[in-house]
């Protein structure tokens, strides 16, 4: 499941960019195809990494959230972002600086942010 490029990018977009709807995932700059996105979201839900709920403002739309299992991937994704920043030009240098300045504080903020979203 996690060896798939698209699954990790979806989790990254949820964790670091705040993407929560199908449309927000499609708007990512990687250009994921709709059939691949739908398949990976289904698999992430089936593996207990992501959960869904109906959007209160539009019951036809789903809101995706990371589960505790998904949030536990924060250290893995942080290391991947830092590795990419060390070896390639990355788009969000401010985020990389935050990670490098105090990785544990950054991770605590990510975890707390998702816990807050889950309690809404």
Regions found by a protein language model. Give the residues of each.
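A general structural signal marking secondary-structure boundaries and capping sites
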Residues: 18, 48, 84-88
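N-terminal helix-turn-helix DNA-binding core of bacterial DNA-binding proteins
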Residues: 1-33
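Basic, amphipathic "hinge/linker" alpha-helix immediately C-terminal to the N-terminal HTH DNA-binding motif
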Residues: 3, 56-80
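C-terminal regulatory/oligomerization modules of transcriptional regulators
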Residues: 68, 75-120
């Amino acid at each position: 499941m996690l060896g798939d490029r698209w699954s990790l990018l979806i989790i990254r977009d949820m964790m670091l960019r705040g993407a929560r709807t199908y449309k927000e995932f499609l708007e990512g700059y990687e250009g994921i195809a709709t059939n691949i996105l739908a398949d990976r979201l289904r698999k992430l839900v089936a593996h207990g990494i992501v959960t869904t709920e109906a959007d209160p403002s539009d019951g036809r739309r789903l809101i995706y959230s990371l589960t505790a299992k998904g949030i536990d991937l924060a250290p893995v994704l942080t290391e991947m972002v830092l590795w990419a920043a060390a070896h390639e030009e990355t788009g969000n240098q401010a985020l990389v600086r935050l990670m490098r300045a105090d990785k544990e504080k950054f991770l605590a903020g990510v975890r707390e942010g998702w816990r807050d979203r889950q309690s809404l």
